[in-house]
Structure formats: C-alpha cells, structure tokens
Amino acid sequence: MKLQKNISLKPYHSFACEEIASLFTSVDTKDALIEAIDWANNNNQPYLILGSGTNILFTKQFNGLVIKMEITGIQKLQETSSEILLQVGAGENWTHFVSYCVQKSWGGLENLSLIPGSVGAAPIKNISAYGVEVGEHIVSVDAFDTIKKQWVTITQQDCAFGYRTSIFKKEVNRYIVCAVQFKLSKQPLLRTDFGAIKSVLHDRGIINPSVESIASAVINIRSNQWPDSKKIANAGSFFNNPSITTTQFDHLILQFPSLKAYPIDDHTYKIDAGWLIEASGWKGVTKNHVGFYQDQAMVIVNYSATKGQTILNFSEEIMQSVLIKFGVNLESAISIV
C-alpha cells in the first residue's frame, strides 16, 4: 500500500477547498481496499472512502486515512435480445458510464446523463433526474460490510431505495460500495415528458426520440442550468427539497400563495428548496467569496474561499433564515466532513 502524508484535498473534491488529509492512499482492487481498511484499523486511524468528491465538503483537516476509490471497469455479465446486465466498478466515472451505454443504445440511464460523480455514489444517493431514479435499473450492489467484515451482495429490494436515499445512506459508513450491477433495455420505455426534455426535442424537430436524442437533450439542459465544477467550484444541489405534512402545507399556502410544492402522497408535500431560499432573500447574495450560481438558488458556489468552513457557515445562515420565515428545516444534500 502506497501511503502519502499531509496531502491537499483540493484536487480531490469539487468545492476545491484547501483542506488536508493527514494520510492518503488510493485503491483499484478489492484486495487493496481491504488492505487499506485493515491498516487503518490496526493503527487506530479513522478512514474515509472518497469517490469523485462531487458530493462532499471538507471543512477541516481530516486526521486519518482518506481512501480514494479507483476500482473501475465495465463488464458484460449477461445479454439477451431485449436486455443486458452489466457490472460496473464503483470508481468508474458516472458520465463516462452513461455515455458508454448511450453509444450502445442501451436504455434506462439516458435521463441521468451528465450527473457528476462516480458509479459507486449512484446507489447511495439513489440519484434521480427528469423522472428517472437509478434504483429502477440496479439489480444488485457488491459492497464490503464493515460490521460483519465480509463481502455482501445486496439486491435491489434490500437496497431500500427511496427519494435520494437508500440503505447505504441510512446505515451510514456500514457498507463500502465496490461494484454495481445494472439491467438495461435494448427496447427501452423512453421518458420524455419530464422537465424540459419534451421542449428540447420539439425545438429540434425530433418526433420519434431515441436513447441518444434524449441523452443529448438532457446534456443540453443540464449544461445550461448547472455549473461545470471544473470551471466553478461547486457540488451541485446543496440542499434537498424538504418534506412537510399536508397540515403544514395548508398553513403555508395561505400565507405564501406562490409557494412551490407538490404532493407525494395523501399526507406529505415536497417544497421547492430553491423557492424557499429565494423567498428568504438570498437570491444573488455573495458573502466571503461564496454565493449562488446565476439564478440557481440550490447551487452554492465557491468563488475563491479557501476554507470549507466558510461555505458551511454560508449554508447554515441560509438554513436558519428559512427556518425563521417558514418554519421548515432545510437539509444538506451533500456530506459534510
């Protein structure tokens, strides 16, 4: 195991803060992962598994071992005339994997094009966009169970997928995802009615959309709405859309008729976090070199702050003002370390 000391984490997370890992290593096999974990445990060092770093904010030095997940590869497990089963390494770049599938005309993930991150992070957050959740297309997940200290294969049902959540998020730090099995279709049911996809296809004169044309439309939409983290430091949506009860919704809609919300079931509503933030007076605000991306109140960007704590302070001010005005708790959509 190659062990590095006092490594800057700036190149390894998209917020690009000048935080330090006291110890750092990368792993590209299951055996290397176990070796790194055993070393950390035997030396009483806390450890953190780091993927692409697009969903994390480091706010201080990490006094332990950062293990960079670099297990990659796309393997065909099974194929029929109508579908294909793939196994993909957790360290594989998500956008690269989706592009690979789109080029083969394998359907299912095209609506999830251009989402930053790694394949291993996809089931953890159950990433979703434009009417599609990744959990719909996951057959199983291979992971290391840090409690039982053994490799496990977790089926789709046992992954307990929900809105941007899963068993991996609920039982935090228990499972280390190493590979994901996907089932994709050669005769996919295309989803074109969600978001601006239908509008883009219409503008392009596309009457009979394909996997490729939908992916292209999604890439166009996301490129116009979301900042490229290689150019502007950010981690995408910083907040989740909060859930409230029907009673809370009835109370709020009387006070704020323009409230943006939609029902989840007979008892629950989801509120647009961006609307709450803008209505609390944060649109266009920049403080200490931290602010929002254009008109996206969900996306906090780091213009030039060197410390992650500055970004965290900014987000906490937003949360507090939303709570005071609306009585609604915003939750961070990213990991805070």
PLM-predicted stretches and their roles:
Residues 44-46, 201, 319-326:
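A common structural junction motif
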Residues 307-322:
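His/Asp/Glu-rich mid-to-C-terminal helical/loop segments that flank catalytic regions of hydrolases
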Residues 37, 98, 198, 274, ...:
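Short glycine-/small-residue-rich flexible loop motifs, especially phosphate/cofactor-binding loops
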Residues 3-5, 10-17, 56, 151-309, ...:
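Phosphate/pyrophosphate- and phosphate-bearing ligand-binding catalytic cores of soluble enzymes
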Residues 36-40, 193-197, 314-318:
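Short amphipathic alpha-helices in soluble, non-transmembrane regions
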Residues 1-148:
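Anion-binding (especially nucleotide phosphate/pyrophosphate-binding) glycine-rich loop
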